[in-house]
UniProtKB/Swiss-Prot annotation:
NDH-1 shuttles electrons from an unknown electron donor, via FMN and iron-sulfur (Fe-S) centers, to quinones in the respiratory and/or the photosynthetic chain. The immediate electron acceptor for the enzyme in this species is believed to be plastoquinone. Couples the redox reaction to proton translocation, and thus conserves the redox energy in a proton gradient. Cyanobacterial NDH-1 also plays a role in inorganic carbon-concentration. Its EC number is 7.1.1.-. This is NAD(P)H-quinone oxidoreductase subunit N. It is a peripheral membrane protein. GO terms for molecular function: oxidoreductase activity, acting on NAD(P)H, quinone or similar compound as acceptor; quinone binding. The gene is ndhN. It comes from Acaryochloris marina (strain MBIC 11017).
Length: 151
C-alpha cells in the first residue's frame, strides 16, 4: 500500500528555510509521521516543550544557571547546565545530516522568540527548527520567517 503523503515537500521546506512553523490537527497523529520522516532523512531529532525555557539565546547557546525550587529549609542553589543546542551539535554522529529541534506548544512563544529561532538556523546550518504553532484541520507548514513577517 503506497503512502499518501511522503513528506518530501516538508523535508524540502525545512532544508531550504531552516525553521518551519507547523499547524497540526488537534486529534494528533500527523506530527508523529512527519517526525519519523525527518529521522529517516538523517536528522537527529530532539523534542522540547517551548514554554518554560526562559531566554532562548542563553538556553540554546550559552552555559546557563538553573535554580531548583526552594522547598522549605533547603539551601538556595544554582546548577549550571551546558548549552542545549551547541552541546548536541558538537556530539552529532558523523552520519547525521544535522539536528532537528521540534518545539511543541510553540503558540506561547513571542514574536521576538520566533524571530530568534529563525535567525539561529541561519547562523548554524546544521540546525533545523520545527515549531508547533497551533491547530488546523490538516497538517500545514510555512517557513518561520514568513510567519514572523506576517505577525
Amino acid at each position: 500500500m503506497p503512502l499518501l503523503a511522503t513528506g518530501k515537500k516538508f523535508i524540502r521546506t525545512i532544508e531550504q528555510s531552516g525553521a518551519v512553523g507547523i499547524y497540526v490537527p488537534s486529534e494528533g497523529g500527523f506530527e508523529g509521521r512527519y517526525k519519523r520522516r525527518l529521522r529517516a532523512t538523517g536528522y537527529l531529532t530532539l523534542f522540547v516543550s517551548a514554554p518554560g525555557m526562559g531566554d532562548l539565546a542563553s538556553y540554546f547557546t550559552d552555559v546557563h544557571g538553573v535554580r531548583p525550587p526552594h522547598l522549605g529549609k533547603n539551601q538556595i542553589r544554582t546548577y549550571f547546565l551546558p548549552p542545549f543546542v551547541t552541546y548536541q551539535l558538537e556530539n552529532l554522529p558523523p552520519q547525521a545530516k544535522g539536528l532537528a529541534l521540534w518545539l511543541y506548544d510553540g503558540k506561547r512563544l513571542a514574536k521576538q522568540e520566533l524571530a530568534y529561532l529563525s535567525a539561529i538556523t541561519a547562523s548554524e546550518p546544521r540546525l533545523k527548527v520545527v515549531v508547533e504553532l497551533g491547530g488546523a484541520r490538516s497538517f500545514e507548514w510555512q517557513p518561520l520567517s514568513d510567519i514572523v513577517a506576517a505577525a
